[in-house]
């Protein structure tokens, strides 16, 4: 710096303290006489050198103004910015990201931080004029903080934890840039002092999680009204009076949420409603388990009981070879009594008639938790098979003993002895056998995929599925198919196992037992003439048999009126219902089933 050019102004303490040297024409305001004279002196003049500051002092003075990215942005930011340069650095996306990352994993603020957060909210009211990125007005936030000091635990400003559950039952942790206590409420049902948790449910309007209470993670850069969202707590509730949606604010503030189990995880709104705050907050949430009222728009979710948004009738109507698609994710109101340890096969009305213990509550779904063993243990390895209980040969008590290999939920019905295991079709008598059930399905609209050709030269295919894969051999007649299936089912000791069950005495021979076992195991259509509807062939995937259940097919009740159901006696080569619910055979593991 000692050899600076002659025209530059020497750095005096006044000029350097103000933030850097000015040009020769502009620096004369502070020293009126000297700069005009000194500017004409050469750089090596002693008078000019005497007025100069040491380089070390200059570096110390200009250290905080030389660069934009100040190291302080890595720390939790204070409520008021220090300088305009630091303010710009704090609003940058990199600074916001670093601030968020530096605060992950910090412990919850102690209870003594309530007063601190109120003071910080008051300071936020002062700083909100300088910083336009504050998401709520400062005075309103301070007033809300003072009002809510006794209601809900106020949040520390430097503890934004996106994954922590709120200690007040659902209060959301705010970003450090947003106000300490949220004034983001529904425009129709409550006012700015509302608790940032769950609305207190009334008798007329079922509760919803407030979407306005979810503050997005980027709320530093949001507009002043950006975090205000209308919560789906509609005021035009159909099942109540005119003002049913208007909840009392005092009641909401006085009571905490009475149903923490119905709340969403974290504090975000229900993501099925797709509010702007719910999608921006990035927090996973579960839909509340309370039933949706008649006036609300239910989110379409297969795991939540609500309005009937699926083309399926109620569970009092039985289905051919299906359990109403519970494994396919239909609402649990169509599958009322599902319990892995009890009978998962009967509808709610039938299980009540049989005196069975009830299953899970109707609000639960078989897919909400982990995969239930009643569906996964008994699954056939055929990719299009959802278990032996989906076969139409089980209707009306026509079954076989080896189906217990598919069905682990059976033994609880063994003592009941009722011949009709499933809720019957309205047109189906209780004494309907398997062949009648097959002949009564001319089109079987559950299987809308593929081509169904009656005049197939080899209509009978072997659907045996072992550990090595499906067999897929084709035969012209059902007798040839059954004789081929005996090669699959011929195991040492199988006849003894089949004869050990009570219904085995009604069989004509062990060959008939093997045929019935093969027909039930492989979901094959029963023996029928090649042109009859029972021998239809599905060409497309794996040439599936008609009694296969497909989870994505349409409901078959559209053609239920045209079904001609003949009444056949139950006597014949079919087992009694006791045989279906015997213990799992030892041959089941040898056959490739689980």
Curated annotation (Swiss-Prot):
Residues 246-256 have a biased composition (Basic and acidic residues). Expressed in mammary epithelium. Residues 1-37, 100-298, 345-370 are annotated as: Disordered. Keywords: Acetylation, Cytoplasm, Metal-binding, Methylation, Nucleus, Phosphoprotein, Repressor, Transcription, Transcription regulation, Zinc, Zinc-finger. PROSITE patterns: ZINC_FINGER_C2H2_2. A zinc finger (C2H2-type) spans 460-488. It holds the Pfam family nlz1. GO terms for cellular component: cytoplasm; nuclear matrix; nucleus; protein-containing complex. GO terms for biological process: adherens junction assembly; cellular response to estradiol stimulus; mammary gland epithelial cell differentiation; negative regulation of DNA-templated transcription; negative regulation of homotypic cell-cell adhesion; positive regulation of cell migration; positive regulation of cell population proliferation; positive regulation of epithelial to mesenchymal transition. One of its GO terms (molecular function) is zinc ion binding. The modification N-acetylserine is found at residue 2. It comes from the Eukaryota. Residues 17-30, 345-356 have a biased composition (Gly residues). It is found in: Nucleus; Cytoplasm. InterPro entries: Elbow/Noc_ZnFinger, Tscrpt_rep_NocA-like, Znf_C2H2_type. Residues 1-14 have a biased composition (Polar residues). The modification Omega-N-methylarginine is found at residue 584. The modification Phosphoserine is found at residue 257. Residues 134-145, 177-191, 212-225 have a biased composition (Low complexity). Interacts with DCAF7 and PHB2. Interacts with TLE4; increases transcriptional repression. Transcriptional corepressor which does not bind directly to DNA and may regulate transcription through recruitment of histone deacetylases to gene promoters. Regulates cell adhesion, migration and proliferation. May be required for segmental gene expression during hindbrain development. Belongs to the Elbow/Noc family. This is Zinc finger protein 703. It comes from Mus musculus (Mouse). The lineage of its organism: Eukaryota, Metazoa, Chordata, Craniata, Vertebrata.
